[in-house]
Regions:
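Active-site core of glycosidic bond-cleaving carbohydrate-active enzymes
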Residues: 24-36, 45, 86, 96-332
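Glycine-rich phosphate-binding loop of nucleotide-binding enzymes
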Residues: 9-11, 36-45, 49-58, 149-157
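Short coil/turn segments at secondary-structure boundaries
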Residues: 28-29, 41, 45, 77-80
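Structural motif corresponding to the C-terminal cap of alpha-helices
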Residues: 1-4, 18-19, 61, 65, ...
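Beta-sandwich/jelly-roll carbohydrate-recognition scaffolds of carbohydrate-active enzymes
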Residues: 1-26, 277, 311
């Protein structure tokens, strides 16, 4: 977004000037998509670019008052869910990428997580977002939990008592996803205030989930896979649940959702919530099954034709999944 002379439009919609040592300023942060594969890949192969991404995010916080969620041309947009600048910043520190203000980064991340909008207030109070209180509350609960885990990891590596207290607070809050895993069905299900929503159908696309259904969001606790396996009665039962997603009929109910494409059973590779699921079989000891599933996705859902992607490229996420999977890696 910065011009050749270092000028850029900030999220306060004023023009600012970069200093010579401040790198580049970026735009188009499709973070709900790209935090999963693209940014982890770039942290590995382009650490200097990731440093500038983080610097850009922190400038957006200073100039506009909050970290980007889905920023476009200096506009916040309010599109999609989560506060997924957080995993990008946390991953940068995990890779020991230097050149950004870590104390400011922690302050910005905590501000994002402690905001009172988009169900965050009730999430902090109740440990989940009741379906009657907020649209897409089930998905928001899960993604807030993951982002909280990333805050905890970042803070725990700062090495001071104040950051340690922040790390512990968010480590505990990151486990809140367990409040919406049904103990009998083993699905992540919508929950009202104090009671499970009735007539749950894991194939139904509705207002409780973000561009997905119960099948596609049940496996989103990447920071707590061991807990997910334990609450679904262990590795064998969990392995069966994952397998059933890939062998279930490829039919959805509820509203029409054009983003749910590239189906193998109820696994939807054309949209991001499913992207890590094939790799979960490795956690159950069935590495061979992960290999089979990843190979099937690579060879059936990507081609070199003009329509060679089974879904939206989403600013590099679909291609980054292919690159990482082609070399046998994935950042669950």
């Amino acid at each position: 977004a910065s011009d050749v002379d270092g000028r850029y439009r900030g999220t306060d919609l004023h023009v600012h000037q970069l200093k010579e040592d401040e790198g580049l300023h970026y735009t188009v942060f499709s973070l709900w998509d790209t935090f999963r594969s693209l940014h982890p890949l770039l942290s590995w192969i382009e650490p200097g670019r990731t440093r500038d991404f983080v610097r850009t995010m922190l400038r957006m916080y200073k100039e506009g008052g909050q970290l980007p969620v889905w920023e476009l041309a200096a506009n916040y947009t309010g599109c999609m869910i989560g506060y997924h600048s957080v995993p990008v910043i946390s991953d940068a520190k995990a890779w020991r990428i230097k050149g950004f203000d870590e104390e400011l980064a922690l302050k910005a991340m905590v501000q994002a997580a402690d905001s009172a909008h988009l169900g965050l207030d009730v999430y902090a109070e109740m440990g989940y977002i009741p379906s009657e209180r907020e649209s897409e509350g089930t998905s928001k609960t899960l993604e807030y939990c993951y982002d909280d885990a990333c805050i905890a990891q970042f803070a725990s590596n700062l090495g001071n008592s104040e950051a340690d207290a922040i790390a512990e607070r968010f480590r505990l809050r990151a486990l809140s996803w367990r409040n919406i895993l049904h103990p009998e069905s083993h699905f992540i299900q919508p929950k009202r205030s104090g009671a499970w929503a009735r007539d749950f159908d894991p194939t139904e696309v509705n207002f409780n989930y973000t561009e997905a259904n119960g099948w596609q969001y049940t496996f989103f606790a990447p920071h707590d896979i061991s807990g997910l396996m334990a609450l679904t009665e262990g590795k064998s039962s969990f392995s069966t649940l994952v397998e059933n997603q890939f062998t279930a009929p490829s039919l959805t109910s509820g509203r029409d959702q054009p983003d749910i494409t590239g189906l193998i059973g109820q696994y939807a590779h054309g949209n991001e919530p499913s992207h890590h699921v094939a790799y979960l079989q490795a956690y159950t000891g069935n590495h061979w099954r992960t290999q089979e599933l990843v190979d099937e996705i690579l060879n059936t859902l990507y081609t070199s034709e003009p329509d060679g992607l089974c879904g939206n490229e989403d600013c590099g996420q679909m291609s980054a999944w292919y690159v990482l999977s082609s070399i046998g890696l994935y950042p669950v």
